[in-house]
């Protein structure tokens, strides 16, 4: 029997953390961060980590598990998330994955093999090469490869082609979880307002000092490449004014949110909820209750 988990995804600033905490309180759960930047110690404001008070109210995992000089990959996330979910489940609690790093979460849910003899970078590159193909073209590739897919869908076809390409045994790519995937969204102009407001609040909370610390200590590490930091580096180098850098950060974050939504819409089987609609949280909680009781 697969382990039931709740997955909360969506663009930045849409309210994933707040909902995850509410779900955890309601259903005796713990939150597992699905964010590639929140793993780094010292990067708190720019990554929008749950506050110390929020983390005290509900256990959070995969936050502050790396130094800024260390790398972190989808393979690392999948390995550590699996162990964390198993621990949470063994204690009779519900695991709630919440975050916006679509690649990490998709890799966890769909049982992608990111280790072994084939470097995971090669697997991810091959997967990306299949994205431009239409469903009809993918079906043709599946037929050419001599593969059989009982009920064709895009994700299943891509996964079968990936496994055939790398010579991996399909039966070894075990899908461990039965997820309910909730994707939060908002009307575009409202979402962009939320993003702009969040960036302003981050600066009020000390983002500039946090980014300057990263710039002074480790400007070329993986952690520094995340949105929220690298956009401010031109200001520190004297190449932009502060206002230009702040607007650059807002623009980059808006574009990132658009890419996130595209990923969740096209690559994952999600249930969308518009956060601006009346009673949306109650409807989400009701769906979760039905899912867990089924």
UniProtKB/Swiss-Prot annotation:
Residues annotated to bind ATP: 10-17
Keyword ATP-binding included in the entry's annotation: yes
InterPro entries: Dimethylallyltransferase, IPT, P-loop_NTPase
Amino acids binding substrate: 12-17
Record-level GO BP terms: tRNA modification
EC number: 2.5.1.75
MF annotations from Gene Ontology: ATP binding; tRNA dimethylallyltransferase activity
Cofactors, names only: Mg(2+)
Record site feature (Interaction with substrate tRNA), residues: 101, 127
Enzyme type, top EC level: transferase
Stretches for region Interaction with substrate tRNA: 35-38
Pfam hit, one: IPPT
PANTHER family noted in UniProt: TRNA DIMETHYLALLYLTRANSFERASE
Assembly behavior: Monomer.
Similarity comment text for this entry: Belongs to the IPP transferase family.
Function noted in UniProt: Catalyzes the transfer of a dimethylallyl group onto the adenine at position 37 in tRNAs that read codons beginning with uridine, leading to the formation of N6-(dimethylallyl)adenosine (i(6)A).
Name of this protein: tRNA dimethylallyltransferase
Organism: Streptococcus pneumoniae serotype 2 (strain D39 / NCTC 7466)
Gene: miaA
